[in-house]
Each structure stands twice: as structure tokens, then as C-alpha cells.
Design a protein with these regions (language model features):
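C-terminal transmembrane helix and the adjacent membrane-cytosol boundary/short C-terminal tail
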Residues: 113-124, 128, 197-226
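Periplasmic/extracellular loop-to-transmembrane helix junction in inner-membrane transport proteins
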Residues: 1-17, 34, 86, 189-190
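Membrane-interfacial helix termini and adjacent extracytoplasmic/periplasmic loops
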Residues: 58-101, 135, 171-175
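Membrane-helix interface segments
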Residues: 34-42, 71, 122, 134, ...
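Transmembrane alpha-helices and adjacent helix-loop boundaries
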Residues: 51-58
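Transmembrane-helix boundary motif in ABC transporter permease subunits
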Residues: 15-47, 62-63, 117, 122-124, ...
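Transmembrane alpha-helices
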Residues: 102, 107-121, 128, 132-163
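Interhelical loop and adjacent transmembrane-helix boundary motif
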Residues: 169-216
Length: 226
């Protein structure tokens, strides 16, 4: 059972990191390229979740994702699902994915933005003037320059996600909980502190291994946090 829990923890942390990257990249690009007054407004929206308690944000997702919640009402309203066939998005992996992605999104946006802000717009224009299409110029010129920010954001989000506790405990249910929830269970319910400590040490060791692998493959000196 613990092997399944470890695999689920890695799976959820991986997909949350992927979802955060897919959402954060265009947001960070807008922050870096929009005029100052609009980018400042967008930055406020990105940082706004930090001004709210994590518990409050998680509780808000519990209200939004329930079967009679706002998200399902919206899906029914646009005809995506039938009213009598509303999907269950609470107490499963879906709830963990959605809530954790929203909560951890700023930790991906900020490293990407700090790198994109230093990239000169003239580089893209030069790529286009040399005969490249906008996509080729982006892929060959712009994207490689953002890799340090991608590495920093992915490493930060993955490490935070792999040890997350409150959000999976409230919205994940039995199929969306992580190893940290099991550690807390043994600490508070079974009082098996030695086993909980061993699991915590394994979690810490796993994080250090991930950090070591990243350093070997990419190089920790290439990380850009701003």
C-alpha cells in the first residue's frame, strides 16, 4: 500500500508541475511583454493568492468543485455535461490536481517571468528577419533562453507538490492523498512516530535525489530565480 502511495505522490506532483508549466508560460510571457500598467495589474492577480490563507483557498475549491458547485453548474450551463450526470471532482485526484495547480501556479510564474524579462525583443525580430517563421523564431531563439526559468520553476513546484499536506487532505479524498498525509496519520492517529519519521526521511531523501539529478543533468548554477 505504501508503494502505491509513493507512486501516487510522484504522479500527482509530476502532473501538477506539468499543468503549472503549461499555464504559467503564457502568463509569464504576457507579464514580460505587456506595457507596464497592464503587466503590473496582471502581476497583482498572480500574487493575489499569497494574500489569502492557504486553508481559505483550499476551502474555496471545496465549494467550487462539489457536484452542485459553480464549476459543475458552468459545465451544465454550456451543455458540456447533463444535469443528472455531473462529474465528481471532489475527494479524488481531480480535486488535488485542480487545487494544487492553482495554489502552486505563482511559484512557476515568477521564475519564468524573471528570465523572460531579461530577453531582448530584438532577438525575436532578428530571428524573423533571418527568414524564420514566428513559431521557428520562438522555438529556436526565445524558448532556449527561458530554460533556466523553466528548470527553476519546475524544480520548485515539484518539490513543494511532493510534500504537500493540507490541500490533498481536504480535497483529495482516499485516491488523492499524498505521502505527507500518511505521515501525519501515523503521527496523530496511530502514534507510530518511528514509522512516520522513517517515511519523512524517505521523502527528504527523495527530494535530495531529485535535486542531485537536476544538478547533474541541467546544472544547479543555471537556475534563475530572479
Amino acid at each position: 500500500i505504501h508503494r502505491v502511495l509513493w507512486l501516487r505522490t510522484l504522479e500527482i506532483a509530476f502532473f501538477v508541475t506539468v499543468f503549472c508549466f503549461l499555464m504559467a508560460y503564457p502568463i509569464a510571457h504576457l507579464l514580460a511583454t505587456l506595457p507596464m500598467k497592464y503587466s503590473n495589474l496582471l502581476m497583482i492577480c498572480v500574487l493575489l493568492p499569497f494574500w489569502t490563507s492557504l486553508l481559505v483557498r483550499t476551502a474555496s475549491w471545496m465549494i467550487l468543485l462539489q457536484q452542485q458547485g459553480v464549476v459543475n453548474d458552468f459545465f451544465v450551463g454550456i451543455g458540456l455535461v447533463a444535469d443528472d450526470n455531473r462529474p465528481e471532482m471532489m475527494y479524488n485526484k481531480t480535486g488535488s490536481y485542480v487545487a494544487m495547480t492553482q495554489i502552486l501556479l505563482p511559484f512557476m510564474v515568477l521564475p519564468l517571468y524573471s528570465v523572460m524579462k531579461t530577453i531582448s525583443p530584438s532577438l525575436m525580430r532578428a530571428g524573423k528577419s533571418l527568414g524564420g517563421t514566428p513559431f521557428v523564431a520562438f522555438w529556436k531563439v526565445y524558448f532556449p533562453l527561458t530554460i533556466p526559468g523553466i528548470g527553476a520553476g519546475c524544480l520548485l513546484v515539484f518539490i513543494l507538490a511532493i510534500g504537500y499536506y493540507i490541500t490533498p487532505a481536504l480535497v483529495g479524498g482516499a485516491s488523492g492523498t499524498l505521502i505527507s498525509n500518511q505521515i501525519a496519520f501515523h503521527m496523530k492517529s496511530t502514534l507510530d512516530w518511528s514509522f512516520a519519521s522513517a517515511m519523512g526521511l524517505m521523502l527528504l531523501s527523495g527530494v535530495l535525489v531529485i535535486y542531485w539529478l537536476y544538478n547533474k543533468i541541467v546544472g544547479i548554477d543555471n537556475i534563475k530565480l530572479g
